[in-house]
């Protein structure tokens, strides 16, 4: 039996030139893996992701959530604060809702050029989401 995996995407619009490329690579990989992207929510930035992730996790037809974002280093430590807090809360939500939430967020501490070289983080996050859903379902059988 083939397990259909339904995904929700939460995408940051900050650094949209990069997150758009990440989103497209992620969509293509989801299709390649036979997963369906049921919902996409675009939020202002990575820090804003947890609430959107929570709303998607509450949906019965979402098996996992993929986060897609890019945090580029600035002149302060703001990028580190944003990524660390978002990642912590995203992980907490996965445990709270008992569904995978994958981290397709590049950064902190990277330049714009490094961010462009890491657009495959969206693909990796989709891969991890699909694997986690399938492996967790296998545990239930």
From Swiss-Prot:
Catalytic activity from the UniProt record: (2S)-2-hydroxy-3-oxobutyl phosphate + 5-amino-6-(D-ribitylamino)uracil = 6,7-dimethyl-8-(1-D-ribityl)lumazine + phosphate + 2 H2O + H(+)
Record carries keyword Transferase: yes
An example molecular function term from Gene Ontology annotations: 6,7-dimethyl-8-ribityllumazine synthase activity
Gene Ontology CC: cytoplasm; riboflavin synthase complex
EC number: 2.5.1.78
Keyword Ribosomal protein attributed: no
Annotated pathway: Cofactor biosynthesis; riboflavin biosynthesis; riboflavin from 2-hydroxy-3-oxobutyl phosphate and 5-amino-6-(D-ribitylamino)uracil: step 1/2
Active site: 78
InterPro entries documented for this protein: LS, LS/RS, LS/RS_sf
Positions with a binding annotation for 5-amino-6-(D-ribitylamino)uracil: 14, 46-48, 70-72, 103
GO biological processes: riboflavin biosynthetic process
Binding residues annotated for (2S)-2-hydroxy-3-oxobutyl phosphate, in chain numbering: 75-76, 118
Keywords on record: Riboflavin biosynthesis, Transferase
PANTHER family: 6,7-DIMETHYL-8-RIBITYLLUMAZINE SYNTHASE (PTHR21058:SF0), 6,7-DIMETHYL-8-RIBITYLLUMAZINE SYNTHASE DMRL SYNTHASE LUMAZINE SYNTHASE (PTHR21058)
Subunit structure: Forms an icosahedral capsid composed of 60 subunits, arranged as a dodecamer of pentamers.
Function: Catalyzes the formation of 6,7-dimethyl-8-ribityllumazine by condensation of 5-amino-6-(D-ribitylamino)uracil with 3,4-dihydroxy-2-butanone 4-phosphate. This is the penultimate step in the biosynthesis of riboflavin.
Protein family according to the UniProt entry: Belongs to the DMRL synthase family.
NCBIfam families linked to this entry: lumazine-synth (TIGR00114)
Name of this chain's protein: 6,7-dimethyl-8-ribityllumazine synthase
Species annotation: Methanocaldococcus jannaschii (strain ATCC 43067 / DSM 2661 / JAL-1 / JCM 10045 / NBRC 100440)
């Amino acid at each position: 039996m083939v397990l259909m995996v339904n995904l929700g995407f939460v995408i940051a619009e900050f650094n949209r030139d990069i997150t758009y490329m990440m989103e497209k690579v992620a969509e293509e990989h989801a299709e390649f893996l036979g997963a369906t992207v049921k919902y996409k929510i675009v939020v202002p930035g990575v820090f804003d992701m947890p609430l959107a992730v929570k709303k998607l996790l509450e949906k019965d037809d979402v098996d996992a959530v993929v986060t897609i974002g890019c945090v580029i280093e600035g002149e302060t430590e703001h990028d580190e604060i944003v990524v660390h807090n978002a990642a912590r809360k995203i992980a907490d939500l996965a445990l709270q809702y008992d569904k995978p939430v994958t981290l397709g967020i590049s950064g902190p501490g990277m330049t714009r050029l490094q961010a462009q070289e890491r657009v495959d983080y969206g693909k990796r996050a989709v891969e991890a989401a699909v694997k986690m859903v399938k492996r967790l379902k296998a545990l239930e059988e």
